[in-house]
């Protein structure tokens, strides 16, 4: 049964309204999407002389954390998480399409743009290095290598490039794809990487030589474009099923690794990176493109996939016939990105919606389940989010960085109230 995640948007500067401390009443709005064609506006009145707020009959609005607010409107609960650091104030204007982070001696961020540029930033979003025209068209993905001293980029120009963070040099370009390269996964220390493309292939590369070791395709349709991939280590059951295969001498760390792919057709495939076999195929349940997918970091049997029609599906790879959970976000509006981190799922939908959904343990089945009844909305000025990036913190639940169009680059704290 499909469940609907009700979407709400709060006035971007509502915190300023709350903190004005005026003698007179003021107000801000929360818009709740009832359906595609109907939006209900709730006016939250901030009473003068610090007398609290009036959210209307039967409704409430309160602060529950340093950057977290809760509204109960017409029986529905909504959480709103506000920005703790606005990186756009430090950056030259651009549309951001890719992000990653690494921390060795110091925290760094990398951002990719629609113009093909790469920006390397320090922990305060100060520009350390800019690689202009790293690609001739939009950058689709950026990944730091585990050393933190090199990164790899992919682009609509059909190429992948390896870069030195220290001096911006490009020691290797990986050429072979015949359409946009959509995604990257790094295996272990980075001698091997995987790349996905709209040409229907997933390529396994050896970075030292730039050699393609193997090309994966969907067996039933080799030209079915790949929008998104995720790498994971097989479960005990999956590892038991690995067939013996002679490893190429250019492969490092591929044993036990699987890559899952979301296709333009909506089909999802799983490939054993070591044996080179396609092991699972999930059907195109919603007859539209699977735009993005991610693996549950706490249980690799479960994956989450976002589709062109606004559906979010949870799949159990042990039961591939149909999803174990179906959720509708902004019906008819594409899901741009799904990302698992810190026990939660982050979802970008359409031009203006960014949601955090906690993953909980279902009390009956004990499987991971999406807690959809109280979504957390990451507050922005109706900005379209391209990608998410988790920033770990030993002292809390960490932070998440969002990047997107119109110079959007914002950091949110994930600590619980």
Curated annotation (Swiss-Prot):
Q: So which domain of life are we looking at? A: Eukaryota
Q: Where are the WD repeats?
A: 134-173, 176-215, 242-281, 285-325, 330-371, 380-416
A single GO molecular-function term is: protein folding chaperone
| Cell location | Cytoplasm; Nucleus
Which Gene3D superfamilies does its entry note?
A: YVTN repeat-like/Quinoprotein amine dehydrogenase
> Keyword annotations for this protein?
Chaperone, Cytoplasm, Nucleus, Proteasome, Repeat, WD repeat
Indicate where this protein is primarily found.
cytoplasm
The annotated subunit structure for this chain is:
Associates with the 19S proteasome regulatory particle (RP). Interacts directly with RPT5 and RPT6.
State what this protein does: Acts as a regulatory subunit of the 26 proteasome which is involved in the ATP-dependent degradation of ubiquitinated proteins. Is not a genuine component of the 26S proteasome, but an auxiliary factor that interacts with the proteasomal ATPase of 19S regulatory particle (RP). Acts as a chaperone which regulates the highly structured assembly of the 19S regulatory particle. Involved in the substrate specificity of the 26S proteasome and is especially involved in the degradation of ubiquitinated GCN4. May contribute to the stability of the 26S proteasome in some stress conditions.
What remark does the entry add?
Present with 2210 molecules/cell in log phase SD medium.
Q: What is this protein called?
A: 26S proteasome regulatory subunit RPN14
* Naturally occurring in which organism (per UniProt): Saccharomyces cerevisiae (strain ATCC 204508 / S288c) (Baker's yeast)
Q: Which gene encodes it?
A: RPN14
């Amino acid at each position: 049964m499909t469940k609907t995640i009700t979407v709400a948007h709060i006035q971007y500067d509502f915190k300023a309204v709350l903190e004005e401390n005026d003698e007179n009443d003021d107000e801000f709005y929360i818009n709740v999407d009832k359906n595609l064609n109907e939006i209900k506006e709730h006016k939250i009145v901030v009473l003068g002389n610090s007398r609290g707020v009036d959210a209307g009959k039967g409704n409430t609005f309160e602060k529950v954390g340093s950057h977290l607010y809760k509204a109960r409107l017409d029986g529905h609960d909504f959480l709103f998480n506000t920005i703790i650091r606005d990186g756009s104030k430090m950056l030259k204007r651009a549309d951001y399409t890719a992000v990653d982070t690494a921390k060795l001696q110091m925290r760094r961020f990398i951002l990719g743009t629609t113009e093909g540029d790469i920006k390397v930033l320090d922990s305060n979003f100060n520009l350390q290095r800019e690689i202009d025209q790293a690609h001739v068209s939009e950058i689709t993905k950026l990944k730091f290598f585990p050393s933190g001293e090199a990164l790899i980029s992919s682009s609509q120009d059909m190429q992948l490039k390896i870069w030195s963070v220290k001096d911006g040099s490009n020691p290797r370009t990986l050429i072979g794809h015949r359409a946009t390269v959509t995604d990257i996964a790094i295996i272990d220390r980075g001698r091997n990487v995987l790349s996905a493309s709209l040409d229907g292939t997933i390529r396994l590369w050896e970075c030292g030589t730039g050699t393609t070791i193997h090309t994966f395709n969907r067996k039933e349709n080799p030209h079915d474009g790949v929008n998104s991939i995720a790498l994971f280590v097989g479960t005990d059951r999956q590892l038991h099923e690995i067939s013996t295969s002679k490893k190429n001498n250019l492969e490092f760390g591929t044993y036990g690794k699987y890559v899952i792919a979301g296709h333009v057709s909506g089909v999802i495939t799983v490939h054993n990176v070591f044996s080179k076999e396609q092991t699972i195929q999930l059907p195109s349940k919603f007859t539209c493109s699977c735009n993005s997918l991610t693996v549950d970091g706490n249980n690799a049997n479960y994956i989450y996939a976002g589709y062109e029609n606004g559906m979010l599906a949870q799949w159990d790879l042990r039961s591939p016939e149909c999803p174990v959970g179906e959720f509708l976000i902004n019906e008819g509006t594409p899901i741009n990105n799904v990302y698992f981190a810190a026990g939660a799922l982050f979802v970008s939908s359409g031009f203006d919606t960014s949601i955090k959904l906690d993953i909980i343990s279902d009390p009956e089945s004990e499987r991971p389940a999406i807690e959809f009844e109280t979504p957390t909305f990451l507050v922005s000025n109706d900005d379209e989010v391209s990608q998410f990036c988790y920033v770990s913190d030993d002292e809390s639940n960490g932070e998440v960085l969002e990047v997107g169009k119109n110079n959007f680059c914002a950091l949110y704290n994930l600590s619980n109230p």
